[in-house]
């Protein structure tokens, strides 16, 4: 987190609406309305801060304030100049009639002290006479005395109020439509949810590194993109107040054009960073015109000329990992890189990476070497995460089911996981075509279609094995897909030797019809779905050994449906009292609730709040982050 963002947490923004009066010896303000904006919803340009003792003492500052709503800038308030959006425009006298004052005004104060200190040491603000002050003090004393019985009553009931039996559910806006029922809301829910609980212990968000955009403090860019000549922040703040440039050319002041008056004006001299595409382009960016004075038709031996431009760059800009020329010609045909740029071999061709592409969370080298040996200085940014092994990845890759860090540390202790060390080594896993890891029993039982061709051996009872022949690869399909009229095997083996439906049961009474195919009666109630409509496992008095029996429905379920997050039995008995091994050891796309024996489908655990009974902070944080991410409002 940036220093500005950290500092803003210690401030509250007070907005007052009323009349202010000034005289030679006093200033007072009659308040009509007051609004307090909580931290993290405003941004402050710390350069413009000035102290004031009108309300909050020396801890109060008046400065440029930017208000946000859902991370979108809604208004910019400039103080100490009053925000006169609702100015009545009338002159009014002070209460004693001696001083002329302005009309209704908005006043802004960014205060570090608590709300109760706003009027401390400023009793003269309202010009109260001493008698009135005495009366106020007397009323305060009477109030304290009257509060004693109430305090005793609350103290005696404090223990009762703090127990888990206290049900705050009626006070929450939660109306569930899906199983399970709403869990009770506790006093802990009144606090904030720490987003740090979303990340594994061996993965860092590198808080405090990078540059926070002034106009959007939630947006952090890597340090490598600060003052490089490109505006990465929407407000361009990453290219302002530069002390040193990463681009090849810089100057101390520049020309700005007034869009209304169509004239160029001189601004306060400051260091600006220019890329080569802004040199010799006919636009004077520097006050002294140096960006347009270095144009030559022929460059010297110690210079490099961009293709299609008259700009001559120093040779140090060649192959330095920074795209200075608009066409990138300064970074082409590189046999050797400078300044930490990276070379990799891809498809037998030398690929030169810009410095900004190294440790950016996206592997562009075949061996992923451009994302290794990174640190928080290089892997900083609101969309990146750093593994303990030095691998830089995108935050969206954390806890996504794929192992991106060595030893899979980015998938450890994620929300919805539990400790399975006792049997983790016994569970065999298969990497399927979608890049995710699945348990072998799940991958090779035909449940996951992306795993059909990834298994060396298919489940003998639950699946049909499509043979490998020619270009056709061996794969596992569900038994219910055999003889269903659809070719699932590449060679059509699943639709061969099938009994026509019209002949089903004529010569062999031990057959029955379902889903346009014949099924042997011996396969009824065996815990395997041979029919797509699952009718072969319904109306069963007994179930085969190893299968699951739904007593309320008289149907049999395959063993792998136990604790898979889907309630197949009408009473939900197949999903009750799930263990960690049953939930995560046998399934891959499941979520184990933190403090219950409930296992849910990971993509169904939030709707939109956590469906876990007795949901913990981690369960709620997971769903809160998911909702914000899906709505495009998550700050990375």
Curated annotation (Swiss-Prot):
Q: Which residues lie on this side of the membrane: Cytoplasmic?
A: 1-130
Membrane topology (Extracellular):
152-636
Q: Where is the LDL-receptor class A domain?
A: 205-243, 244-296, 298-335, 336-375, 378-415, 457-499, 503-541, 542-579
Q: Which organism is it from?
A: Caenorhabditis briggsae
Top-level taxon: Eukaryota
**Bilayer-spanning residue ranges:** 131-151
Kindly list the GO CC terms recorded for this protein: plasma membrane
The record ties this protein, via Gene3D superfamilies, to: EGF-type module (4.10.1220.10), Low-density Lipoprotein Receptor (4.10.400.10)
Q: Which gene encodes it?
A: egg-1
Q: How does the protein's chain sit in the membrane according to the entry?
A: Single-pass type II membrane protein
Function noted in UniProt = Probable receptor which is required for the oocyte-to-zygote transition although its exact function is controversial. Seems to be required for fertilization probably by promoting the interaction or fusion between sperm and oocyte. Conversely, shown to be dispensable for fertilization but required for the formation of a continuous and cohesive eggshell chitin layer by maintaining a homogenous distribution of chitin synthase chs-1 at the unfertilized oocyte cell membrane.
- Give GO terms for biological process: single fertilization
Task: List all disulphide bridges recorded for this chain.
Answer: 213-233, 227-242, 245-273, 251-286, 280-295, 299-312, 306-325, 319-334, 337-365, 359-374, 379-392, 387-405, 399-414, 458-476, 466-489, 483-498, 504-518, 514-531, 525-540, 543-556, 550-569, 563-578
Q: Spell out the InterPro entries in the cross-references.
A: LDL_receptor-like_sf, LDLR-related, LDLR_class-A_CS, LDrepeatLR_classA_rpt
Location in or out of the cell: Cell membrane
A Pfam cross-reference name: Ldl_recept_a
Which keywords, in A-to-Z order, does the entry hold? Cell membrane, Developmental protein, Disulfide bond, Fertilization, Glycoprotein, Membrane, Receptor, Repeat, Signal-anchor, Transmembrane, Transmembrane helix
Q: What is this protein called?
A: LDL receptor repeat-containing protein egg-1
Glycosylation site residues = 202, 508, 614
After gene disruption, what is the outcome? Answer: RNAi-mediated knockdown results in sterility due to the loss of oocyte fertilization.
């Amino acid at each position: 987190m940036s220093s500005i963002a950290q500092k803003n947490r210690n401030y509250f923004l007070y907005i007052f609406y009323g009349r202010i009066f000034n005289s030679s010896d006093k200033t007072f303000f009659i308040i009509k309305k007051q609004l307090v904006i909580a931290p993290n919803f405003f941004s402050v340009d710390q350069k413009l801060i000035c102290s004031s003792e009108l309300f909050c003492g020396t801890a109060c500052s008046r400065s440029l304030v930017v208000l946000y709503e859902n991370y979108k800038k809604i208004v910019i308030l400039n103080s100490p100049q009053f925000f006169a959006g609702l100015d009545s425009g009338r002159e009014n006298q002070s209460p004693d009639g001696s001083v002329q004052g302005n009309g209704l005004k908005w006043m802004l104060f960014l205060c570090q002290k608590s709300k109760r200190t706003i009027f401390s040491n400023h009793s003269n603000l309202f010009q109260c006479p001493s008698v009135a002050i005495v009366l106020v003090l007397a009323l305060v004393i009477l109030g304290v005395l009257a509060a004693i019985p109430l305090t005793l009553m609350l103290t005696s009931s404090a223990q009762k109020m703090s127990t888990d039996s206290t049900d705050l559910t009626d006070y929450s806006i939660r109306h569930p439509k899906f199983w399970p029922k709403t869990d009770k809301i506790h006093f802990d829910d009144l606090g904030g949810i720490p987003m740090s609980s979303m990340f594994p212990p061996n993965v860092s968000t590198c808080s405090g590194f990078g540059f926070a955009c002034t106009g959007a403090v939630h947006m952090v860019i890597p340090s490598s993109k600060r003052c490089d000549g490109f505006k990465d922040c929407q407000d361009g703040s990453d290219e302002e107040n530069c002390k040193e440039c990463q681009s090849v050319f810089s100057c101390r002041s520049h020309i700005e054009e007034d869009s209304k008056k169509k004239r160029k004006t001189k601004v306060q001299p400051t260091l600006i960073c220019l890329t080569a595409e802004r040199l010799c382009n006919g636009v004077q960016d520097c006050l002294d015109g140096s960006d347009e004075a270095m144009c030559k038709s022929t460059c010297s031996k110690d210079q490099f000329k961009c293709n299609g431009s008259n700009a001559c760059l120093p040779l140090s800009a060649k192959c330095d990992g920074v795209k200075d020329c608009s066409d990138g010609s300064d970074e082409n045909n590189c046999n050797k890189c400078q300044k930490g740029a990276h070379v990799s071999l891809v498809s037998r061709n030398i690929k030169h990476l810009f410095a900004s592409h190294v440790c950016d969370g996206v592997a562009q080298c075949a061996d992923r070497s451009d994302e290794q040996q990174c640190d928080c200085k290089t892997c900083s940014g609101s969309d990146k995460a750093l593994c303990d092994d030095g691998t830089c990845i995108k935050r969206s890759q954390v806890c996504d089911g794929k192992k991106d860090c060595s030893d899979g540390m980015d998938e450890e202790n994620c929300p919805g996981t539990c400790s399975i060390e006792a049997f983790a080594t016994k569970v065999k896993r298969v990497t399927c075509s979608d890049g995710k890891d699945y348990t072998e029993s799940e991958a090779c039982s035909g449940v996951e279609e992306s795993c059909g061709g990834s298994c060396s051996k298919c489940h003998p009872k639950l699946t049909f094995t499509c043979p490998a022949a020619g270009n056709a690869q061996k794969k596992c399909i569900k038994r219910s897909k055999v003889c269903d009229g659809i070719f699932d095997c590449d060679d059509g083996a699943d639709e061969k030797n099938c009994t026509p439906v019209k002949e089903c049961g004529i010569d062999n009474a031990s057959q029955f019809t379902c889903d346009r195919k014949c099924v042997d009666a011996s396969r009824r109630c065996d815990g395997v779905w041979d029919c797509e409509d699952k009718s072969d496992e319904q109306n069963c008095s007994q179930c085969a050994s190893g299968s699951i029996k739904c007593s309320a429905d008289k149907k049999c379920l395959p063993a792998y449906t136990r604790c898979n997050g889907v309630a197949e039995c009408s009473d939900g008995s197949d999903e009750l009292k799930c263990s960690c091994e049953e939930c995560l050891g046998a399934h891959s796309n499941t979520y184990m609730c933190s403090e219950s024996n409930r296992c849910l489908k990971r993509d169904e655990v939030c709707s939109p709040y956590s469906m876990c009974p007795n949901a913990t902070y981690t369960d709620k944080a997971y769903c809160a982050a998911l909702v914000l991410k899906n709505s495009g409002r998550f700050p990375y």
